[in-house]
């Protein structure tokens, strides 16, 4: 009699994905972030579901309902802060996961990579709409500023913005639809994650050497299940420390003031995980140019497989490319810092330089350095 795990139509799929999956024997902790992102997504859906039970998507009561969750609902404060800080953890892991993909050349799995970039866009859209829901000052003005960017689209722009708003400004209709989209998108993301995994399992995982590992595979369970559990443990310790001790560390104090269309906050800025893109947007003095740069700063990830000019897949044995990779990381940290600063000298100039450098490293320096490394190795 065959094992149920291997014969049952549904359990068989789980078995091939998480139990008997052949995995490279040398994948490092950088490969933990996929499972951590999965746990984050599950946690966000779960906490979000409980928040939605008590939240009201109406301009007059939204802010009060969030206050009610924190004050009156059993462990409401815990659920709310786990959801808010869980989003921050989600983005930290996303950026590590993408960075890992760039460093080790995982982007050569074209299908997996492209669906991953689409996933990034979907998660960013979800996070943005979630930030609008508490209906604080930064929620309202963030929504106003970001949706207004669409007015830069030639010809259809202004009509498009009013269509998204459901009126002539960000109001009740906007909040209601943002709540609807914020609720449905995580489930669409879950479906996309399944496609992401489907494409990954077609090829098998990459590994730090960037070489074919078919000759040395080990079963996913117990080796990588236990490794993932350790990663999840570290994640939960970090998340719960953040939630219990400094829940508002990554938030904006302005969002504790109810939304007021008649009073603009002195510095409108998004959550920390969007600051690098916001800095790129602000560094261009033209509205349409800024919007294009903003979209391209993420969409540029799609170009990595095309721009790959090295004969080696991974950066493990390419010191010059490694230097550029860490330059890119430093550059993104500078952009994140600039995105949170007011628009004045010297921040404007630093932001413009960092924005140009970002595109220059990816589009010119990385491919040309890879070609130079090929030459140095006489390939």
UniProtKB/Swiss-Prot annotation:
Pfam families per record: Cytochrom_B_C, Cytochrome_B
Keyword Transport: yes
Broad class of where this protein is predominantly found: mitochondrion
Membrane-crossing residue ranges in chain numbering: 33-53, 77-98, 113-133, 178-198, 226-246, 288-308, 320-340, 347-367
Membrane topology listed for this record: Multi-pass membrane protein
Residues noted as binding heme b b566 in the record, renumbered to the chain: 97, 196
Keyword Mitochondrion: yes
Subcellular localization, as worded in the UniProt entry: Mitochondrion inner membrane
GO biological process: mitochondrial electron transport, ubiquinol to cytochrome c
SUPFAM superfamilies: a domain/subunit of cytochrome bc1 complex (Ubiquinol-cytochrome c reductase) (SSF81648), Transmembrane di-heme cytochromes (SSF81342)
Record text on cofactor binding: Binds 2 heme b groups non-covalently.
Extra remark beyond the main annotation: Heme 1 (or BL or b562) is low-potential and absorbs at about 562 nm, and heme 2 (or BH or b566) is high-potential and absorbs at about 566 nm.
Assembly notes: The cytochrome bc1 complex contains 11 subunits: 3 respiratory subunits (MT-CYB, CYC1 and UQCRFS1), 2 core proteins (UQCRC1 and UQCRC2) and 6 low-molecular weight proteins (UQCRH/QCR6, UQCRB/QCR7, UQCRQ/QCR8, UQCR10/QCR9, UQCR11/QCR10 and a cleavage product of UQCRFS1). This cytochrome bc1 complex then forms a dimer.
Protein name: Cytochrome b
Organism: Ctenomys australis (Southern tuco-tuco)
């Amino acid at each position: 009699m065959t094992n149920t795990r291997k014969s049952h139509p549904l359990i068989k799929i789980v078995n091939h994905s998480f139990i008997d999956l052949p995995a490279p024997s040398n994948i490092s902790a950088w490969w933990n972030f996929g499972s951590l992102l999965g746990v984050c997504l599950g946690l966000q859906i779960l906490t979000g579901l409980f928040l939605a039970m008590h939240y009201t998507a109406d301009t007059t009561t939204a802010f009060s309902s969030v206050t009610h969750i924190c004050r009156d609902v059993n462990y409401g404060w815990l659920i709310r802060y786990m959801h808010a800080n869980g989003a921050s953890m989600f983005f930290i892991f996303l950026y590590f996961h993408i960075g890992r993909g760039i460093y080790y050349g995982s982007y050569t799995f074209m299908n997996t990579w492209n669906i991953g970039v689409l996933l990034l866009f979907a998660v960013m859209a979800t996070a943005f709409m979630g930030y609008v829901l508490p209906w604080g000052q930064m929620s309202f003005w963030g929504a106003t500023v970001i949706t207004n960017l669409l007015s830069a689209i030639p010809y259809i722009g202004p009509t498009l913005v009013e269509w998204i708003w459901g009126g002539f400004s960000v109001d009740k209709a906007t909040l209601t639809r943002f709540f609807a989209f914020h609720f449905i998108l995580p489930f669409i993301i879950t479906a996309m994650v399944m496609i992401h995994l489907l494409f990954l399992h077609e090829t098998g995982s990459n590994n730090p050497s960037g070489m074919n590992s078919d000759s040395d595979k080990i079963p996913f369970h117990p080796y990588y299940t236990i490794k993932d559990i350790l990663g999840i443990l570290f994640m939960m310790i970090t998340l719960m420390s953040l939630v219990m001790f400094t829940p508002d560390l990554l938030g904006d104090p302005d969002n504790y003031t109810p939304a007021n269309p008649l009073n603009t906050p002195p510095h409108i800025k998004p959550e920390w995980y969007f600051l690098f893109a916001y800095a790129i947007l602000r560094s261009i003095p033209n509205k349409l140019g800024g919007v294009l740069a903003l979209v391209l700063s993420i969409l540029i990830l799609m170009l990595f497989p095309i721009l790959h000019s090295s004969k080696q897949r991974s950066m493990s044995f390419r010191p010059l490319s490694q230097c550029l990779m860490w330059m890119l990381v430093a550059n993104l940290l500078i952009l994140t810092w600039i995105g949170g600063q007011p628009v004045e000298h010297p921040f404007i100039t630093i932001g413009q330089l960092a924005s140009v450098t970002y595109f220059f490293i990816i589009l010119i320096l990385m491919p040309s350095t890879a070609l130079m490394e090929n030459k140095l190795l006489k390939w």
